[in-house]
Design a protein with these regions (language model features):
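Rhodanese-like catalytic fold shared by cysteine-dependent sulfurtransferases
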Residues: 2-8, 18-41, 46-50, 58-90, ...
């Protein structure tokens, strides 16, 4: 009986934690501007003609990325200096594989003075799940 109760509690906690990991669409007002977590549909529509930044490694980027994206690896020691070469007053659209690195990159961009940062909810995984194309 104890084993069954422990198993049920473990399953419930696992499902709860997994459900909380994916970021939901949201808007965070920062000192310098706003960070928007947006759906793949909104990202696709609103990023046309804008700066799209893929923060994954160059190897991940080479395996497929959103068309028109530039690769600025979050783990690169020059990540912030590369970001600063972009116009901070224009919207930027940032993504990674699942959304975790994007959250970090979005906060860094905002601290650097970017006024309108858009974070792809669920990253490239969710982009592909929505049947949107990637390019190599």
């Amino acid at each position: 009986m104890k084993l069954l109760l422990k198993s049920v509690i473990f399953i419930f906690l696992t499902i709860s934690v997994i459900g909380c990991l994916e970021k939901k669409p949201s808007k965070t007002v920062t000192e310098n501007g706003v960070i928007n977590v947006i759906t793949p549909s909104d990202f696709k529509t609103n990023s046309v003609g804008q700066v799209i930044i893929d923060v994954r490694t160059p190897e991940e980027f080479a395996n497929g990325h959103i068309e028109g994206a530039i690769n600025i690896n979050l783990f690169d020691k020059n990540f912030e200096s590369k970001l600063l070469k972009l116009d901070k007053s224009k919207p930027v659209f940032i993504y990674c594989r699942s959304g975790r690195r994007t959250a970090t990159a979005s906060k860094k961009a905002s601290k650097l003075g970017f006024e309108n940062v858009n974070d792809l909810q669920g990253g490239l995984q969710k982009w592909v799940k929505n049947n949107y194309k990637i390019t190599k």
